[in-house]
Amino acid sequence: MSYDHVIYERRGHVAYVTLNRPERMNALDAHSHAELIEIFDDFERDPDAWLAIITGAGDRAFCAGNDLKATAQASANGEQRVGRDARFAAITRSYDCPKPLIAAVNGVAAGGGL
């Protein structure tokens, strides 16, 4: 499956997850969170995926955290979401994943990107 803001690849038993918004320092918006939720749900259920490595595209940032510009725009448009619909904490919402997750931090890691 292909995604807009995240690259997901499986090589052997390793899942590679790349945050792919280098022009926004890989900041996470609601769409990114939705994609990450789907990716990590699939990863957790896949018996052939033994571990995941998450990194950021580009050379400036691993992840700048929440995309504040997108959040402000959504709020101005009346699209503010709360609870599970907010799509935040895509990775950390499930602390009981039995598989290792490795963060290959390459550059800035701030806020929720840390």
What would you call each of these model-derived segments?
Residues 59-63, 110:
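Short, active-site-adjacent cap segments at secondary-structure transitions
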Residues 1-55, 59:
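Conserved CoA-thioester-binding segment of acyl-CoA-metabolizing enzymes
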Residues 27-30, 64, 73:
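Phosphate-coordinating loops and pocket residues in cytosolic domains that bind phosphorylated ligands
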Residues 25, 106-108:
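A short, acidic beta-alpha loop adjacent to the nucleotide-sugar donor pocket found in many GT-B
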Residues 112-114:
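Active-site-proximal glycine-rich helix-loop-beta segment
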Residues 35-41, 68-106:
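An acidic, glycine-rich surface segment that forms the CoA-thioester-binding/catalytic face
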